[in-house]
Amino acid sequence: MDTIKFDTIESAVEDIRQGKLVIVIDDEDRENEGDFIAAADHVTTEMINFITREARGLLCVAVTMERARELQLDPMVQRNTSQHETNFTVSVDAIAEGVTTGISVYDRATTIKMLGDPASHADSFSRPGHIFPLRAMDGGVLRRVGHTEAAVDLARLAGCSPVGLLCEILHDDGSMARLPELLKFKEKFGLKLITIKDLVAYRMQRNKLVERAVESKLPTAYGEFGLIAYESFIDHHNHMAFVKGDVSSGEPVLVRVHSQCATGDTFASLRCDCGNQLASALRMIEKEGRGVLVYLMQEGRGIGLINKLKAYNLQDEGFDTVEANEQLGFKADLRDYGIGAQILQDLGVRKMRLLTNNPKKVIGLEGYGLEIVERLPLEIAPNEVNQFYLETKRDKMGHMISCSCHKGH
């Protein structure tokens, strides 16, 4: 996609401000699809008619978490197993004069506009309906690089209510339209075509999810590091960066993005390999003489300490680590790397040699404009307690582990 001349984010925002549609495409490593996106404030019957005729996808409306709470838009399901964690709520129709079955272009346009109208309330809608709201993560594309977050971000940047219409664009044969077809759409209808990657870069230059709170020095058993504490504007958690040497020179930097594991990092739990990975990463950075370890407060792959301990109990009953999370209603891995990416950007890191076995982490960081020039494994020899855990991460979560684990169990 780098050889294609995409439109600027500024030009797309101006079109949305003027009530026009834009085409937004995401990364080839993710859904690799294009969506029509517009601000809910400017939706018309003509626009809905055009979208249903030309795009043929599902009409959805992206709303903020706050707006979803105001309108009591509850999750469509309690256990979301969507591949890309698309956060659907229960579908709705507007309760308003002239709205009948909810399916006409007038009915759907009215529902969409009312979802963005601050005067609307929970009782303004019937459930289920013909419009599908989606809850965007707080922080937008800086937290999740999806069309849902892009729709909210673009509407907000255009000075509209942070509620956006989006619809996937399908090919004539019903398959997903990819970049060549989307370029034809752009030329045929005179629409702007932008990428979520460019929107992330635009917001990274203008908006911050974290700020430096304090800097200090920390002598450790592995060496002395500069320690920088960050405060998140989104969840108000404190995250840390252990820094060795000059990491802002432009040369590739040895990097580890490590999520908190109190049981492993602090108490040397044998259930996981987290504590040993943390120690190994710090040793490797010290030996290198230059590098960063970002420590994110995402306990238990994002489910928190209490739920992690509940998952331990389920594992003792015979469930593996993925099944235990699913039994509790969670995806196998709820971590996001937007905050970690902003910390690395703040430190001046642009190219990295990433210490990880996790392919999701590679994709997650690359989505924020950071170049991973090399992936280095961080393998820990299994013990009799965590061998099945490591096998599960390899076999079910795609972790690139080539340790002396044996398939089975």
Curated annotation (Swiss-Prot):
D-ribulose 5-phosphate binds at R30, E31, D35, R144, V145, G146, H147, T148, E168. Its cofactor is Mg(2+); Mn(2+); Zn(2+). Zn(2+) binds at C261, C272, C274. The keyword Nucleotide-binding applies. InterPro entries: DHBP_synth_RibB-like_a/b_dom, DHBP_synthase_RibB, GTP_cyclohydro_II, RibA, RibA-like_sf, Riboflavin_synth_RibBA. The record marks H130, E168 as: Essential for DHBP synthase activity. Residues 1-205 are annotated as: DHBP synthase. It catalyses: D-ribulose 5-phosphate = (2S)-2-hydroxy-3-oxobutyl phosphate + formate + H(+); GTP + 4 H2O = 2,5-diamino-6-hydroxy-4-(5-phosphoribosylamino)-pyrimidine + formate + 2 phosphate + 3 H(+). Gene3D superfamilies: DHBP synthase, GTP cyclohydrolase II. Binds 2 divalent metal cations per subunit. Magnesium or manganese. The keyword tRNA processing does not apply. One of its GO terms (molecular function) is zinc ion binding. One of its GO terms (biological process) is riboflavin biosynthetic process. It holds the Pfam family DHBP_synthase. Mg(2+) 2 binds at E31, H147. Pathway: Cofactor biosynthesis; riboflavin biosynthesis; 2-hydroxy-3-oxobutyl phosphate from D-ribulose 5-phosphate: step 1/1; Cofactor biosynthesis; riboflavin biosynthesis; 5-amino-6-(D-ribitylamino)uracil from GTP: step 1/4. Residues 206-409 are annotated as: GTP cyclohydrolase II. Keywords: GTP-binding, Hydrolase, Lyase, Magnesium, Manganese, Metal-binding, Multifunctional enzyme, Nucleotide-binding, Riboflavin biosynthesis, Zinc. GO terms for cellular component: cytosol. In the N-terminal section; belongs to the DHBP synthase family. In the C-terminal section; belongs to the GTP cyclohydrolase II family. PANTHER family: 3,4-DIHYDROXY-2-BUTANONE 4-PHOSPHATE SYNTHASE, GTP CYCLOHYDROLASE II-RELATED. Catalyzes the conversion of D-ribulose 5-phosphate to formate and 3,4-dihydroxy-2-butanone 4-phosphate. Catalyzes the conversion of GTP to 2,5-diamino-6-ribosylamino-4(3H)-pyrimidinone 5'-phosphate (DARP), formate and pyrophosphate. This is Riboflavin biosynthesis protein RibBA. The lineage of its organism: Bacteria, Pseudomonadati, Chlorobiota, Chlorobiia, Chlorobiales. The gene is ribBA.
